[in-house]
Amino acid sequence: MAFVPAPGYQPTYNPTLPYYKPIPGGLRVGMSVYIQGVANEHMKRFFVNFVVGQGPGADVAFHFNPRFDGWDKVVFNSQQDGKWGNEEKKRSMPFRKAPAFELVIMVLPEHYKVVVNGDPFYEFGHRIPVQLVTHLQVDGDLTLQSINFIGGQPAPSPGPMPNPGYPGPGKHNQQPCNLPCMEGAPTFNPPVPYKTRLQGGLVARRTIVIKGYVPPSGKSLVINFKVGSSGDVALHINPRLTEGIVVRNSYLNGKWGAEERKSSFNPFAPGQYFDLSIRCGLDRFKVYANGQHLFDFSHRLSNFQGVDTLEIQGDVTLSYVQI
């Protein structure tokens, strides 16, 4: 069962290195690039480049380069006409060897904003116009789990992390009308427990995206799709870390239904990031994790359109929720 990303959400899972690929539709203000990976135990350095074109001698609008060299630091720069510009550096290392990390680079009107594991780290002023950037390049001593290009939604959502305005879809990022849709704007790093209203209800073809991190001491977390007025839960997703299973259920008319436990794999593990896409279909929910089909859950609540609330709680740190 193939994974099809929703509009404005362009993920690549387990990409190989060196990574040098076009940015879908080109780079533009309001986009964010999410990079999840693991720093190698013997890491010396890695880099992320926002590149104008492809091939030797291409200009680099933004060069992000963590260096473990005894004087741990992160270097920032640009390259034009084959020459590096004035180097900026920060003598602080947000990455540790071996643990998983999440790097977010937000493209704002005046600068790139770098966020590591949810914490703002650096701002690098634009030296080359953003709209000229066409490719993303990543290489070095790391293993990539996913690269996500996020953008193209119509309005920002307030949240703890400053959220860039998302421009309306242009000719480069229009999506076929049969793709699943996301109704709301993204929220970055919301606190847990998390609760939000699903404006318009849980209609068929709607997709919810949840990106998060399970702490090393994590034991359990819960995701509920709920009818606010009655308390009914159309879909209850309960990863139990100590048991290594993902339990699904419903709670209707004051009673829990039969648990479903079988799944093709378990993406939830202590100390790991996850990327969950939950699609509502006419007869079932289809749930994907890290680009792979995880499970289906047939509707038990006939009026699933009445689901108007999303709840997330437990041992999880959320980095991104798109409704």
Swiss-Prot record:
CDD domains: GLECT. One of its GO terms (molecular function) is carbohydrate binding. InterPro entries: ConA-like_dom_sf, Galectin-like, Galectin_CRD. SUPFAM superfamilies: Concanavalin A-like lectins/glucanases. It comes from the Eukaryota. Contains two homologous but distinct carbohydrate-binding domains. PANTHER family: GALECTIN, GALECTIN-4. Galectin that binds lactose and a related range of sugars. May be involved in the assembly of adherens junctions. This is Galectin-4. It comes from Sus scrofa (Pig). The gene is LGALS4.
